[in-house]
UniProtKB/Swiss-Prot annotation:
GO molecular function: rRNA binding; structural constituent of ribosome
Physiological role: Protein S19 forms a complex with S13 that binds strongly to the 16S ribosomal RNA.
Gene coding for it: rps19
HAMAP family according to UniProt: Ribosomal_uS19
Record keyword Cytoplasm present: no
GO cellular component: cytosolic small ribosomal subunit
Domain of life, per lineage: Archaea
Protein name (record): Small ribosomal subunit protein uS19
Phylogenetic classification of the source organism: Archaea, Methanobacteriati, Methanobacteriota, Thermococci, Thermococcales
SUPFAM superfamilies: Ribosomal protein S19
Length: 133
């Protein structure tokens, strides 16, 4: 029977990450995320964190929706369902331990994969001689 491997981020367990201050945690993050946190959180990001903390306590009942795609995923967000705007609609994102240190926007894709239809008449040389439906 295979045991689930314990999650570690840069050698620290999830419990250790939760107990860390934001300053200590930022030292573990990649440079882009570290600089983003060092500049300080925007008012929208602070509002999102406030909603997440209220939801964890059970005081915020509505689904958490955000346009703030540039928010770095912190350990206190793990386990939450956040609806992230992709430019058209809000995409549900379940925050997992493996996502710590990434941006929320990375998990709500802004572009859809192209699904081309069948080519029209005259699209290729051989299709000129195909009977029209």
């Amino acid at each position: 029977m295979a045991r689930k491997k314990e999650f570690k981020y840069r050698g620290y367990t999830f419990e250790e990450l939760i107990n860390m201050s934001l300053e200590d945690l930022s030292k573990l993050l990649p440079s882009r995320q570290r600089r983003s946190l060092k500049r300080g959180l925007t008012p929208e990001q602070k509002k999102l964190l406030r909603k997440i903390r209220l939801a964890k306590k059970g005081k915020y009942k509505k689904p958490i929706r955000t346009h703030s795609r540039d928010m770095v995923i912190l350990p206190e967000m793990v386990g939450m369902m956040i609806y992230v705007h992709n430019g058209k609609e809000f995409v549900p994102v379940q925050i997992r331990e493996e996502m710590i240190g990434h941006y929320i926007g990375e998990f709500a894709l802004t572009r859809k994969r192209v699904q081309h239809g069948s080519p029209g008449v005259g699209a290729t040389r051989s299709s000129m001689f195909v009977a029209i439906k």
